[in-house]
Amino acid sequence: MYIKNLITCFCLIFLLTDCKENPFMKTEKYPYAVTTTAPEDYPMEVHIGYFLDEKEELICGVPKTGSVESGWQYQGAEGGQGGDKIPAYLSLTYVSYAEKKFYNVEAKLPAEKILEEFRKGYKLKKYMSDETEDLTYGKLTVGMAPGGVVVLWLSGKSHRVEICRLQAKEVFVDKDDFRRRVIENETQQEFFDARYEGALSDSIKQDIKERGIPFGLWDEYREKYNYRFTFRPYDDRDKFTYINALYYNGEAEEILKPDLALKKYTSRGIPYRCNFIFFSYSTEIIFNDREMIQVFKEMKKKHPGKPIDIILTPTFLYNEIKVSVKCEDEEIPLFKYIMEGVWGESIDDALERRALEENNGNGE
């Protein structure tokens, strides 16, 4: 009897340990919508796609929303597809109109990483407040880029994190199966040619004719560098108070006061569009991808292993903000960024206004 009870105990311990190590034994639910996107000017369209869970059971389809090209840095189009189980497998077939090709990918997904990111979530700054709230992601975004590049992200409010990069292969799909209607005497090539003419802008067609499709660009976007944003004010009272950053690799984040105060270097993709808020001014800057790739690669080659600073230097009265990249004792000015504008008031005016607001709030 003693031996029987001992064996039973060991079996229970083994089962409990096994359940503890398998994250999918848990009943956690993270509802999400599936979205699709593609680089601006390089339209893609889903033919058929779906996600399976770890038991190879269907979770949902990949939405068919027509041609998509909303941009690599944005969440893209929804189409009524989603679920709350952790996806473990993706099947996707789509057409790349710029390349006149169909692609297919059949791939296992890093389910444990997806679960980890759902659990970790992110902190979101509350509107007009320094307080934050803990949220998690609500969208699973599928990105399709030229060359069969497929990237998955988890997307939330002002936050986006890459899950994995997959490689699709060229595949034949009959145009009539894709379109589900037959145009008599139309060849497969004529179908591609017509879609190419209709889906691409004249400017991008000319660009492709002269320089070709920039294969590899979206993998260059994925390279990360150890850097931080640095503010070089002419008034020592001024400082960063908030940064909302989109990166060319499709990731996004808010950098809040506690992290800004640490002034730490972080591994990130090159910046795309950033909203910088200072003590009393704010600005929005769009960085040029080619310039940033060139400068960062140059700095990495000349200063291996050293962290990099992107420095913002305002001119008097914030009429303009100069941007440069610095590593050790070398500093390179940037010229191709676009500054959307500078908004705000002087620090003295801001301090006076805030003091009045505080006094009024206290009933004085």
Over which residues does each language-model region extend?
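Structured interaction patches on ligand/partner-binding surfaces of diverse proteins
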Residues: 99-124, 281-317
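Sec-dependent signal peptide recognition
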Residues: 2-9
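C-terminal motif of bacterial Sec signal peptides marking the signal peptidase cleavage site
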Residues: 15-18
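Long, low-hydrophobicity ectodomains and other hydrophilic envelope-associated domains
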Residues: 182, 190-275, 279-284
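Bacterial signal peptide processing site
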Residues: 20-22
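Tryptophan-paired
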Residues: 49-96, 239-293
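Structural motif
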Residues: 34-45, 230-239
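Compositionally biased low-complexity segments at domain edges in trafficked proteins
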Residues: 117-218, 299-364
